[in-house]
């Protein structure tokens, strides 16, 4: 039997998942893990969602749904855009996906061919780069720094040559948490329309924005040619339910329907039924309560990092991460994070995951967990850093 592995499978790992594996082993062997490596909310799904799931299990009516998702959920999502953003979204434009990860795969397959040039910010979410590379696209990474809040601008896109076929933006962004101001997102969307470039707008962290940050906006407020990606994982704390959605332009809907029907048949039906209840006032109040907890954690982490000598931090407008410059201590963030875990039991994510050129000098620290974990992590890191 041949030992050949397809070339497209040779993408880099998502290093955060490797960190999680090492963290689990640390907990198994030492029992002292403090895990600040991933965007895993400590809160569970809202109570109305869990109650709806229990009722659906009791009825035992969990066969396939149509590929694009159950009508009740598509209706609820469409109505939520009117409430939150004041825009009218037809339920037919909403496509339910197997997490936002499944949504990105569908969007990239529907929008781009092998060889197409697709731009993204660096630092940025590594799975954009890795999925696009596996599909044969040419990924154009745009170095972004403090001058633009680690975000691309329409002017930066206009200066790229040869021309692009697509652009991926995220607001709030992972790993930095920065928000693209509404006027800049509108400028990016307008430039994409004028340049025949497909915009993919990652809005997974909408709802998680802190006081004083720019307001978040939806790409569809400017352009219905964009593909919007969102998820139940972050604001609604439903990571393991594997449910997300797309807003899809009319011209792409049949293609997305065919792709999802062939790939997954349908998203998880139990999750779909339960998620309808995420849009109740009770569930929204619970999710907003989580945001208040994250805000406390954010202050704890930002203040604590500065006290221990890590003070060059990306503006943490939203999401639940701090992207920190640790160049005073290392130029190899992967080795730095591995040693931190081995020496102290604290797990954080290496910046090399998010920026292949400059990420050796950065780390990402999540504050989605309990406040006590953040306080303990700061104590351990503060004791450990002077020896590095």
From Swiss-Prot:
Its EC number is 2.6.1.66. Its cofactor is pyridoxal 5'-phosphate. Keywords: Aminotransferase, Pyridoxal phosphate, Transferase. SUPFAM superfamilies: PLP-dependent transferases (SSF53383). It catalyses: L-valine + pyruvate = 3-methyl-2-oxobutanoate + L-alanine. The keyword Glycosyltransferase does not apply. CDD domains: AAT_like. One of its GO terms (molecular function) is valine-pyruvate transaminase activity. The modification N6-(pyridoxal phosphate)lysine is found at residue 234. Signal peptide: none annotated. GO terms for cellular component: peptidoglycan-based cell wall. GO terms for biological process: amino acid metabolic process; biosynthetic process. Pfam families: Aminotran_1_2 (PF00155). Belongs to the class-I pyridoxal-phosphate-dependent aminotransferase family. This is Valine--pyruvate aminotransferase. The lineage of its organism: Bacteria, Bacillati, Actinomycetota, Actinomycetes, Mycobacteriales.
């Amino acid at each position: 039997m041949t030992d050949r592995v397809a070339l497209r499978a040779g993408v880099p790992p998502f290093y955060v998942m490797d960190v999680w594996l090492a963290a689990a082993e640390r907990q198994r062997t030492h029992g002292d893990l403090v895990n600040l490596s991933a965007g895993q909310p400590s809160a569970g799904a809202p109570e109305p969602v869990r109650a709806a799931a229990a009722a659906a299990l009791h009825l035992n009516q969990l066969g396939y749904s149509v590929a694009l998702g159950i009508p009740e959920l598509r209706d609820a999502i469409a109505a939520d855009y009117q409430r939150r953003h004041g825009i009218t979204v037809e339920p037919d434009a909403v496509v339910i996906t197997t997490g936002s990860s499944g949504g990105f795969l569908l969007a990239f397959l529907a929008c781009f061919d092998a060889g197409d040039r697709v731009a993204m910010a660096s630092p940025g979410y590594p799975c954009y780069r890795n999925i696009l590379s596996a599909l044969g696209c040419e990924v154009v990474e745009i170095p972004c720094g403090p001058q633009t809040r680690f975000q691309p601008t329409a002017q930066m896109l206009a200066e790229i040559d040869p021309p692009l076929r697509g652009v991926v933006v995220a607001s709030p962004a992972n790993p930095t948490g920065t928000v693209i101001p509404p006027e800049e997102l509108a400028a990016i969307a307008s430039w994409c329309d004028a340049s025949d470039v497909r915009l993919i707008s990652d809005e997974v962290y909408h709802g998680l924005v802190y006081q004083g940050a720019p307001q978040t906006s939806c790409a569809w407020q400017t352009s219905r040619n964009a593909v919007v990606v969102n998820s139940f994982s972050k604001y609604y704390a439903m990571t393991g339910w594997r449910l997300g959605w797309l807003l899809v332009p009319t011209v792409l809907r049949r293609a997305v329907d065919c792709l999802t029907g062939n790939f997954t048949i349908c998203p998880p039906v139990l999750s779909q039924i339960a998620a309808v209840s995420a849009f109740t006032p009770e569930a929204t109040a619970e999710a907003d309560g989580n945001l208040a907890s994250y805000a406390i954690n954010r202050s704890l982490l930002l203040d604590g990092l500065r006290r221990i000598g890590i003070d060059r931090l990306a503006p943490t407008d939203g999401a639940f991460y701090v992207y920190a410059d640790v160049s005073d201590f290392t130029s190899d963030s992967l080795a730095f994070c591995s040693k931190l875990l081995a020496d102290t039991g604290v797990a954080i994510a290496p910046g090399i995951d998010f920026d292949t050129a400059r990420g050796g000098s950065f780390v990402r620290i999540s504050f989605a967990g309990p406040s006590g974990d953040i306080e303990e992590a700061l104590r351990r890191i503060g004791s450990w850093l002077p020896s590095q």
